[in-house]
A protein has these predicted regions:
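Generic N-terminal targeting/processing segments that precede catalytic cores or assembly contacts
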Residues: 3-134, 138-231
Length: 231
């Protein structure tokens, strides 16, 4: 209690660190096999999909999201040591958040975090609860996806719904690797392209009113061997 925990996994262990308006954010991946080739161009393609400031549907904050690998990677391959990468923060406007300690934003972590961490948490930009922290998570996911693909496993996702507008759901018994690849190449991934246009219109309308709306993401994995998971 009173400790922010940002790590997941057992055999592959991911720790995400940093805060929205701190000097940097980053990720540490432990347990990666040595000798795994990582194509950094493919990693950067996924980082670009997440990066804000390029579209009205995303936050206007612009960051380069250029991960700098500090350890665990040499000559294009993993070394077996923890893979650590940092992403510098540059476009911060901390003065915009000076009133949050008195007026928490509805629907955000401001108030519960203030209570749980006794007011010592960094509230600037949401601190460690900011969407900014998805950048190192995407880096880690892009690395792990390449390793999984060499083992015949792939993972992908699409926007299932936003504010009452629904996309076509995955067929629970027939999700193809080709579909997952197509979705992972698009900035706003939907199976039904008409749904994307309607969702964008809903987001634009909320943005015009100074509001925000929620959504649901559906994820699928293919090629997982039977019996995987659990104890």
């Amino acid at each position: 209690w009173g400790v922010i925990v940002c790590n997941w996994g057992n055999k592959i262990h991911l720790t995400v660190f940093g805060e929205s308006h701190g000097p940097a954010i980053g990720a540490v991946l432990e347990g990666l096999p040595a000798g795994e080739a990582i194509d950094m161009e493919k990693v950067m393609a996924q980082m670009a999909r997440r990066a804000p400031g390029h579209d009205i549907t995303a936050t206007p904050r612009y960051e380069s999201d250029e991960p700098k690998i500090l350890s665990g990677f040499l000559n294009g391959k993993t070394t077996g040591a923890p893979l650590c990468a940092v992403i510098r923060n540059s476009n911060t406007h901390s003065e915009d958040y000076k009133d949050i300690c008195h007026i928490p934003r509805p629907g955000h972590s401001d108030y519960p975090a203030m209570v749980r961490y006794h007011g010592f948490n960094d509230i600037r930009g949401g601190g460690s609860f900011s969407g900014r922290l998805t950048a190192p998570a995407v880096f880690a996911g892009a690395v792990c996806r390449q390793i999984l693909r060499r083992r015949g496993i792939d993972v992908g996702a699409h926007v299932l719904s936003i504010h009452g507008v629904s996309d076509t759901p995955f067929d629970p018994v027939n999700v193809s690797a080709e579909l997952l690849e197509d979705l992972s190449s698009r900035y706003f991934p939907t199976i039904d392209h008409a749904a994307e246009n309607t969702m964008r219109a809903e987001i634009a309308a909320a943005n015009k009113m100074g509001d925000s709306i929620g959504g649901v993401v559906e994820c699928a994995a293919v090629g997982i061997p039977a019996g995987s998971g659990g104890g």
